[in-house]
């Protein structure tokens, strides 16, 4: 079976030199939470990654099309459209794309003093069900904002901004109800046509 870590058609990814990241760890607006690497992989057939000893960073994977799988702590899970996983540091794991319906994923590595505050109690896939308040596109716009800023991370102010945005991005998964609450109208009546239009935009 073919196994590929990265180098896919249409992929986008950004990383910064470890020496630069080490210097940023002294910055109070960065060292609590920051991106180490970030990317987007579209329909990545044969995608596979295994870490036999885990990593010193956490990783978020958000699947928006297709499906894949994820193995950790002796259990294997299917990861489908509108599901995400947060992989904790220090634990061996592996994951990969489904052969017949390979996933499209947005992913990032994150680190910092507050990293563990964003880890789940159980590292299993979580579903984000689309509805009229789902804000799926808002979340992807946040990702793109982080990606764009981090890609300019050689300039300290852009790195700081990417770290500030990272709080909001991670919170959009972990505090899903609160993230969606802003879309719930204060009026008692929410027009049916508005709900239909929003759903079509999200899907």
Predicted regions and their residues:
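Amphipathic alpha-helical segments enriched in hydrophobic/aromatic residues interleaved with Lys/Arg
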Residues: 117-187, 194-198
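Residue-level marker of regulatory loop/turn positions in helix-turn-helix DNA-binding domains and
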Residues: 27, 52-55, 185, 189
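N-proximal short alpha-helices
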Residues: 4-7, 11, 33-36, 135, ...
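Generic signal for short, ordered secondary-structure residues
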Residues: 10, 17-18, 39, 125, ...
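N-terminal regulatory/effector-sensing and dimerization cores
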Residues: 30-125
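Short, charged, low-hydrophobicity "junction" segments
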Residues: 6-18, 115-120, 141-145
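Short helix/strand-capping hinge loops at secondary-structure junctions
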Residues: 202-203
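A short, N-terminal "cap"/entry segment at the start of jelly-roll beta-barrel domains
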Residues: 1-34, 51, 153, 176
């Amino acid at each position: 079976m073919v196994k590929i870590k990265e180098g896919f058609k249409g992929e986008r990814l950004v990383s910064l030199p470890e020496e630069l990241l080490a210097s940023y760890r002294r910055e109070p607006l960065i060292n609590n939470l920051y991106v180490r690497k970030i990317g987007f992989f579209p329909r990545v057939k044969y995608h596979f990654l295994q870490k036999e000893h885990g990593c010193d960073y956490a990783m978020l994977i958000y699947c928006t099309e297709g499906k894949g799988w994820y193995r950790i702590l002796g259990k294997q899970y299917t990861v489908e459209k509108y599901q995400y996983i947060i992989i904790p540091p220090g634990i061996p794991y592996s994951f990969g794309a489904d052969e017949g319906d390979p996933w499209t994923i947005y992913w990032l590595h994150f680190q910092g003093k507050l990293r563990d505050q964003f880890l789940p109690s159980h590292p299993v896939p979580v579903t984000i069900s689309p509805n009229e308040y789902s804000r799926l596109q808002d979340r992807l716009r946040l990702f793109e904002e982080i990606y764009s800023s981090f890609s300019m991370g050689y300039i300290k102010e852009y790195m700081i901004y990417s770290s500030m945005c990272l709080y909001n991005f991670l919170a959009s998964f972990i505090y899903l109800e609160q993230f969606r609450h802003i879309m719930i109208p204060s009026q008692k009546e929410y027009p049916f046509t508005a709900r239909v239009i929003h759903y079509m935009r999200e899907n």
